[in-house]
Amino acid sequence: MIGNISFTPDGWEDYVSWLGEDKRTLKKILKLIEDITRNGYTGIGHPEPLKDNLSGYWSREIDDKNRIVFRVDEGNLEITQCGSHYRDK
């Protein structure tokens, strides 16, 4: 079970940018966050563990171009990205 949900500064910037850009995508992001809090590393959005410099992080598809990148650490969800492709962490 997930306790707290937090965003890195970049993750929050991505999230807030969807508020003014695309409410439909924002709704999908919220649905993914809800599913992550319930199911962790399984569920909708094709969960995938990331490798190399993103080892320990997972991604889920928001749409064909965008991904939500996150990790669960000590029962807390940290969202590092809600946008296009993977940035170096």
PLM region spans:
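Enriched for short, Lys/Arg-rich terminal
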Residues: I2-N4, D10-K27, I44, W58-R67, ...
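Alpha-helix boundary/capping residues
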Residues: W18, I33-I36
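Short amphipathic alpha-helical surface patches that serve as generic macromolecular interface elements
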Residues: I29-L30, P47
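A short, surface-exposed loop/turn module that caps and links secondary-structure elements
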Residues: D35-E61
